[in-house]
Amino acid sequence: MPSGFPQSPRTSPRARPKTRITGALPMDYSEGLSAEERPAHAPSAGKFGERPPPKRLTREAMRNYLKERGDQTVLILHAKVAQKSYGNEKRFFCPPPCVYLMGSGWKKKKEQMERDGCSEQESQPCAFIGIGNSDQEMQQLNLEGKNYCTAKTLYISDSDKRKHFMLSVKMFYGNSDDIGVFLSKRIKVISKPSKKKQSLKNADLCIASGTKVALFNRLRSQTVSTRYLHVEGGNFHASSQQWGAFYIHLLDDDESEGEEFTVRDGYIHYGQTVKLVCSVTGMALPRLIIRKVDKQTALLDADDPVSQLHKCAFYLKDTERMYLCLSQERIIQFQATPCPKEQNKEMINDGASWTIISTDKAEYTFYEGMGPVLAPVTPVPVVESLQLNGGGDVAMLELTGQNFTPNLRVWFGDVEAETMYRCGESMLCVVPDISAFREGWRWVRQPVQVPVTLVRNDGVIYSTSLTFTYTPEPGPRPHCSAAGAILRANSSQVPSNESNTNSEGNYTNASTNSTSVTSSTATVVS
């Protein structure tokens, strides 16, 4: 008899009044209120309704932030594809988009608002989600008492002719203070899962090694029976409430079992050995061979690329026909039966048939460094890469990403850098001299690593996962004002020397903080 996994607690969200929101939310809900009606924490307008000038971030405030790190983070988890609904049918997105509020900043913000006179309800974050189409009603998310919520009834109809769309999450506090509008990554609209033998010509429907997928099981095609592979409390289980995003890694066929393993590039094909690793916990399942499912059989000889929303089975390698299977909320091993008439097939039950789909994540992090602000914190800039340009005494850093605006400045640690906005995807700044971080230093004596951060002109801090490292030089660099001249010129040109060395051959590195996932393999009970 299979032994069970810990059962995840079920929560029944309280019924909430339906609210229709189709237009954009106002930027400042406290405008037009009297002094008595205005929330105590809300910045008041100046004379004749003029807003007070924004507070620029101070160096002391940045130091406090770097020490405390009280960030507020909005995570939007969703599938990369969505199946279109035809006529009156509603094919709800599966897995359902999920919004998480992460970071200690949410609790601190709530406590601060309540200290300033807000009630518990007024300090509660509220959220609505939609598909970015004003014709369709946005749905309210229930975030009361927890840090996540799923949108289980979103769909896109055939009257919507878009081939791609983005989810839109509108957030505000219970007292109507605006937080902003957060967008998901791009989602591709498909008509239905491809039943033809897939080819790599449709690469956007194939699944690459090292990307994230969700797996769900639906008994007898009943929506209410849908369960998702998920990790909770150090155990794999089949959850009806939450879904997990798992890295799917392609392995060599002769790769042995272990916590460390070598992965391959390329697209996942049926018949190949894969490893599923939870993107949150690092928990991993044993080595698996992914097999195509046809009705209630696993095909042993299929070798075509795995495609979005395909049904597949996972054979536990080096076992006697054991497959990854669910039994209610438990994850177990199920022993398949050979097909007497077809040697290339094995009979499995419904619980061993999993639907696979690629997933994505949009992540937005912010912190009100100088206290509450009037404007929404969105759009939240996202830095994707750094490129060091120039050499010698002119060290300039180019930032590439999304949602850049002219009112942003680049900070290196607690030092603000001279910044030039180029476009929504590119910014340029002068790298501060090492003396700004180490008083008395004229050149770099030992490696110094500082975080790279973006700051809005009203004190909102947007952290990145990027750092900048000063590495030792043999002597001082001569001072030159050329960098300032480059910034003052309204030109998108950058110095032609784009290597990562200066004229003396010394390295100054822009780097991403990457964390390697160490997986711990879980045992699947039989």
Swiss-Prot record:
Q: Which GO terms describe its molecular function?
A: chromatin binding; DNA binding; DNA-binding transcription activator activity, RNA polymerase II-specific; RNA polymerase II cis-regulatory region sequence-specific DNA binding; RNA polymerase II-specific DNA-binding transcription factor binding; sequence-specific DNA binding
Note whether Protein biosynthesis occurs among the keywords: no
Location of the protein in the cell: Nucleus; Cytoplasm
- Annotated stretches, region: Disordered: 1-57, 491-526
Q: Key word Transcription regulation present in the record?
A: yes
Q: Which Gene3D superfamilies match?
A: 2.80.10.50, Immunoglobulins, LAG1, DNA binding domain
Write out the function statement from the record.
Transcriptional regulator that plays a central role in Notch signaling, a signaling pathway involved in cell-cell communication that regulates a broad spectrum of cell-fate determinations. Acts as a transcriptional repressor when it is not associated with Notch proteins. When associated with some NICD product of Notch proteins (Notch intracellular domain), it acts as a transcriptional activator that activates transcription of Notch target genes.
At the top level, the lineage of the source is: Eukaryota
Please identify the protein, giving its name as recorded: Recombining binding protein suppressor of hairless
Q: Where is the IPT/TIG domain?
A: 381-471
Documented effect of changing R422E: No effect on interaction with L3MBTL3
Q: Where is the composition biased (Low complexity)?
A: 508-526
* Organism of this sequence: Mus musculus (Mouse)
Sequence positions bearing N6-acetyllysine: K201
Basic and acidic residues: compositionally biased ranges: 48-57
Which keywords has UniProt assigned to this entry? Acetylation, Activator, Cytoplasm, DNA-binding, Notch signaling pathway, Nucleus, Repeat, Repressor, Transcription, Transcription regulation
Q: What is known to happen upon mutating F172R?
A: No effect on interaction with L3MBTL3
Q: Where is the composition biased (Polar residues)?
A: 1-11, 491-507
Q: Which family does it belong to?
A: Belongs to the Su(H) family.
Impact of mutating R186E?
No effect on interaction with L3MBTL3
Cite the residue spans of the region called DNA-binding. Answer: 83-93, 191-196, 218-223
Quaternary organization: Interacts with RITA1, leading to nuclear export, prevent the interaction between RBPJ and NICD product and subsequent down-regulation of the Notch signaling pathway. Interacts with activated NOTCH1, NOTCH2 and NOTCH3. Interacts with MINT/SHARP. This interaction may mediate the recruitment of large corepressor complexes containing proteins such as HDAC1, HDAC2, NCOR2, SAP30, FHL1/KYOT2 and CIR1. Interacts with EP300, MAML1 and PTF1A. Interacts with SNW1. Interacts with CHCHD2 and CXXC5. Interacts with BEND6 (via BEN domain). Interacts with NKAPL. Interacts with ZMIZ1. Interacts with RBM15.
List the GO terms this entry assigns under cellular component, sorted alphabetically: cytoplasm; MAML1-RBP-Jkappa- ICN1 complex; nucleolus; nucleoplasm; nucleus; transcription regulator complex; transcription repressor complex
